[in-house]
Design a protein with these regions (language model features):
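Short glycine-/aliphatic-rich beta-strand segments at the starts of folded cytosolic domains
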Residues: 85-145, 208-216, 379-383
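Flexible, glycine/charged-enriched surface loops at secondary-structure junctions
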Residues: 102, 162-169, 201-203, 242-248, ...
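Iron-sulfur cluster-binding cysteine motifs and their immediate structural context
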Residues: 268, 311-333, 337-361
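Charge-rich, low-complexity segments
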Residues: 2-121
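A glycine-rich phosphate-binding loop feature that marks nucleotide/adenosyl-phosphate handling sites
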Residues: 209-212, 249-258, 415-428, 448
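Small-residue-enriched alpha-helical segments and adjacent helix-cap loops
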Residues: 2-22, 28, 103-111, 133-299, ...
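C-terminal, charged low-complexity interaction regions
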Residues: 426-473
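A hydrophobic, small-residue-rich beta->alpha segment in the mid-to-C-terminal subdomain
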Residues: 360, 366-409
Length: 473
């Protein structure tokens, strides 16, 4: 089925929207850059330009020179913003502490997220960054861009912001680094009305959903990651723009177990493509790999001579559940023991494919260290069909978990920490699902078993008021 956007789309033409001419965009020479000095003395920042790696300081100096030559009449905030930024960074290196402070909540009308307020506590020394707010822009699914869009975006931020951007933040957003409060509403208007792009999430809300390239270009995608990401973004607009959660919540959509957006490590709820039937095998292609007729790993490791392909060492022995073996010249797989790691498929992509009955595995609880340590996602739903409009997932998984988390979660407590605190048993109860071996971390050490009346033949009744009338505290 062809993709149908929820809103009418228009084609952007940079030449109709551009703010700067080609001469203004390319307004300095490499010789000028070599001789350029910013207005602050920043020896430690300068030192970061040395060495073999690309330097953000070198990039910042290019932008500083570009803005200085553009002049104030072509910019809506101070032209020295990047120079002052490097100056304050040098002070932070000298003092061993940050010089950004929180001075209150800033944002755009109607939204509780999308803007991260940032103010300098050295405003007299660095007035151009007295305000230096960050804006998060909701990226297109799978980060597909064309040149007209990117150039228009860059012109807008050059004109109304610092000109510095980050492609992309760890959640996936386009990051606009540094502008003044007065520019937030005009930028938001241009983004939404001209570029048809929304702000992303920030604060204690649903963060911008992010997905891999999916069926657009990847043969292994087991569901349409872009469609699901788009639908969840639209369906949960209120949760994305108006913070109501105990803390942040992230969706990430991986089309297959290769996990190209690392959802298993970075998302409160990970959707990883999988299959529930058997891996498909082309035995002739298996023999072609063994005989050296087909290069393993699709040629990805051709940088050196690894010797003749050995299916035992490179595939069978590396299977985490040891569910593969050769028998009579054929590759055999015990699919009920397969853990869907994709290793064998990655090594022999012309011989093995995922099954035909595809869907998603849903995992919950990954996070970085906040209240507790970092942790990976917990497999919660081994298989679920993922088909538009995804009501089975919304109604049976997402919303029951949110209801529990918003009721029971402490301030700044991620979902994974709530599960740590209240136990996996509570999660199982909320979702009304059976326990699985994957949920067992270690043998139990608590000698007591707490039975529910429905678990005991004949049941039992317990009147706590009657008990307390006879046994005072």
């Amino acid at each position: 089925m062809a993709f149908e956007p929820k809103e009418p789309q228009k084609e952007l033409k940079y030449n109709e929207l551009r703010i700067y001419s080609d001469e203004e965009l390319h307004n300095y020479t490499e010789e000028e850059l070599k001789n350029f000095k910013i207005k602050h003395n920043v020896p430690m920042c300068d030192d970061l330009e040395s060495g073999p790696w690309p330097s953000f300081v070198a990039d910042a100096k290019r932008e500083a020179l570009h803005r200085r030559k553009l002049g104030k009449e072509k910019l809506m905030i101070e032209r020295d913003v990047v120079e002052d930024l490097l100056g304050q960074l040098e002070r932070s290196f000298e003092h061993g502490e940050t010089h950004w402070k929180h001075g209150g909540i800033v944002g755009v009308f109607g939204y509780g997220g999308g803007v991260i307020g940032r103010y300098s506590d050295l405003q007299e020394e660095f007035p151009s960054i007295a305000h230096f707010h960050t804006m998060r822009v909701n990226q297109p699914a799978s980060k597909f861009y064309n040149s007209d869009y990117l150039r228009t975006l860059c012109d807008l931020w050059e004109y109304r912001g610092s000109g510095m951007m980050n492609f992309h933040g760890s959640t996936g957003d386009i990051i606009f680094l540094g502008t003044f409060t007065e520019q937030l509403e005009p930028i938001f208007y241009e983004l939404t009305h001209v570029l048809q792009q929304d702000l992303g999430g920030s604060g204690s809300n649903l963060r911008t959903p992010s997905c891999c390239i999916g069926k657009a270009r990847c043969e292994w995608a087991c569901y349409d990651t872009q469609d699901m990401c788009y639908e969840m973004t639209y369906h949960y607009q209120d949760e994305l723009h108006r913070p109501a959660f105990p803390y942040k919540f992230k969706f990430k959509f991986d089309g297959c177990p290769n996990c190209c957006v690392a959802s298993i490590a970075r998302a409160d709820m990970s959707f990883i493509g999988t299959w529930r039937d058997n891996i498909r095998i082309d035995q002739k292609a298996v023999q072609a790999y063994i005989g050296g007729e087909i290069i393993p790993n699709a040629g990805a490791h051709r940088g050196r001579d690894w010797g003749k392909f050995d299916i035992d060492k490179e595939v069978i022995d590396l299977c985490p559940t040891k569910c593969m073996w050769m028998e009579g010249g054929k590759l055999m797989i015990d699919d009920k023991e397969c853990t869907r790691c994709m290793h064998c498929i990655n090594v022999m992509p012309q011989a093995l494919w995922p099954g035909k009955e595809t869907g998603v595995s849903i995992l919950v609880g990954a996070k970085a260290p906040i209240l507790e340590g970092a942790q990976m996602s917990l497999l919660t739903i081994p298989f679920m069909k993922a088909e538009y409009p995804y009501d089975n997932i919304k109604n049976n998984v997402i919303e029951p978990i949110w209801e529990w988390w918003m009721e029971e979660g402490k301030n700044r407590e991620r979902l994974g920490e709530l599960i740590q605190r209240q136990g996996i048993q509570k999660l199982i109860q909320i979702l009304n699902i059976p326990a699985m071996p994957q949920m067992v971390k270690e043998p139990r050490s608590n000698p007591y078993i707490f039975w529910k009346s429905e678990d005991v033949p004949g049941g039992f009744k317990r009147d706590i008021k009657d008990y307390r009338s006879r046994h005072k505290r």
